[in-house]
Amino acid sequence: MKSVLLSCLLMVSASPALAGAWAREKGELFIAAGGNFLLSEGAQLPVHYDPTLYAEWGLTDRITLGIDVHTADKGQIGTAFAFANIPIGDLTAQNRWAVNVAYGVRATNRQPTETLLRAGFSWGRGIENGWLAVDTSATIGTIDTTWRPKMDATWGRNWNDRWTTTLQLQTGQGWTDDVYAKISPTVIWNWKPNMKVAIGAVQGLTGDRGAALKLETWLTF
């Protein structure tokens, strides 16, 4: 049961944008892809189709490398990062900590493509039949020279070997200086030993307060 819970922790803390406090095992590859669909009428910001592609690979037991590709602002901004995630302290402790550094680019029709730097800090804690996690980061660009913060807070519960649920609050500062907040409940189905399907909803708490359903596929090799 402990290994099942740890596997779920690793999977969910990896989604949507940051490697979490739990390191990927050495040699393990994780890939997640998905997006939103069935948008509510008028939904544009902060909830849109928002397709994502995310991958992690365990270089060592303490270094996880990955890529993070996504769109934002009604699909008008495309961002891609390569990152390294490094845990701090005891890898078997109940409370886990990690730092994350990333280098990337942002493309938009409003200005030339710019280089980005991102720094992050994560905390996670295993609890009975589940976990808590907080992932924070700040991004700065060579053109947009403002540090823009982001925070995702997640509560997850492992019901059995097949089903897991999560509730995530996503907050941050957008590219146009708007402050956004979204909440996302999700059900995760362990379809095969190396494949999980996550389906849920996203509800904007700011902006036009639009909503959507979301679907993601997670693969582990």
Predicted regions and their residues:
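Cleavable N-terminal export/targeting peptides
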Residues: 1-26
